[in-house]
Amino acid sequence: MRKIGIIGGTFDPPHYGHLLIANEVYHALNLEEVWFLPNQIPPHKQGRDITSVESRLQMLELATEAEEHFSICLEELSRKGPSYTYDTMLQLTKKYPDVQFHFIIGGDMVEYLPKWYNIEALLDLVTFVGVARPGYKLRTPYPITTVEIPEFAVSSSLLRERYKEKKTCKYLLPEKVQVYIERNGLYES
């Protein structure tokens, strides 16, 4: 059975925090690969202005291209409407029956698990991996594997705000992603 990690998100924009989480879990669990799964429309972000799929995908390709064990999974981008993890993982487990999927989520999402669509059935499809900051306990009634990662306090929303305020984002996201954002005028007021 192959072991593959999946990290989902809008990646608007992708940053070093995403890459750090993926790399730490990859090594901690001896995974074969980590697949980045960009969302079409995340249910918890409906109604929010999201950068185009094309731009988010291009930035994600630039961010992950240097790591041979990172790939991009387009499963959710091929569907219209909200992206529910259960629907996606049902499709992926049918498509890849020889894979044990490890679905990577942040500490904030661990506490949100009881509200996930079809969570009980989803638990039969994936092993959840919760990433925690040092000294932070993940509390959930569901079985999860915990991986402690170094603290790196950056988020896509912080980066969008910094770009709007014309503040530097150097060392927070890959340089090629920065160049793409600046050339395309993303996140300007």
UniProtKB/Swiss-Prot annotation:
GO terms for biological process: NAD biosynthetic process. CDD domains: NMNAT. Pathway: Cofactor biosynthesis; NAD(+) biosynthesis; deamido-NAD(+) from nicotinate D-ribonucleotide: step 1/1. It holds the Pfam family CTP_transf_like. Keywords: ATP-binding, NAD, Nucleotide-binding, Nucleotidyltransferase, Pyridine nucleotide biosynthesis, Transferase. Its EC number is 2.7.7.18. Transmembrane segments: none annotated. SUPFAM superfamilies: Nucleotidylyl transferase. It is an enzyme of class 2 (transferase). Belongs to the NadD family. NCBIfam families: cyt_tran_rel (TIGR00125), nicotinate (nicotinamide) nucleotide adenylyltransferase (TIGR00482), PRK00071.1-3 (NF000840), PRK00071.1-4 (NF000841). This is Probable nicotinate-nucleotide adenylyltransferase. The lineage of its organism: Bacteria, Bacillati, Bacillota, Bacilli, Bacillales. The gene is nadD.
